[in-house]
Amino acid sequence: MQSEGRVDHRPINMTSNTQTTASPDRPPLRVLIVEDETLISLFLQDVLRDLGHTVSGIAPSLRTALAVAAGTPSDLAIVDVGLAGDGGDGIDTAVALRERHGIPSLLMTGASFAELGERIQSADPVGFLTKPYTESDVESALNGAIAKLVA
């Protein structure tokens, strides 16, 4: 959200009017988007809606993600590994969401996941998404995450 040329980084509660009909073979998820780039967040929000999922919130930082998670149930978080700022990076955020709220994470990055080494394993991700990505890539990553979550 922008006003007067500045980005508003308050958490957004998106639990109403954001769910479309999910397919019978794919349960709808309540997804928390943790991304500090507004355009990427908005793209993911649109893709998730198109795929029949609900966006439970959008957070640009670890602290905001924890605040949203404390007040709004989420089944999954899509977390940018390169998250900057308030409280830690995306791996720290994924670990905190899992440990404090039981929310698994699908991690996304523009870097190679191999470059991130063992640290990424501490987040115990249910999937990965490499930037840049398409709607189809997001759908594939979500389907993989759903398969792990229901297994």
Regions found by a protein language model. Give the residues of each.
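As written
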Residues: 119-129
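Acidic, metal-coordinating helix/loop segments flanking the phosphotransfer/catalytic sites
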Residues: 45, 58-76
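Non-catalytic signal-transmission and effector/linker regions of two-component phosphorelay proteins
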Residues: 1-32, 39, 136-151
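Hydrophobic/aromatic residues positioned on beta-strands within the core alpha/beta folds
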Residues: 108-109
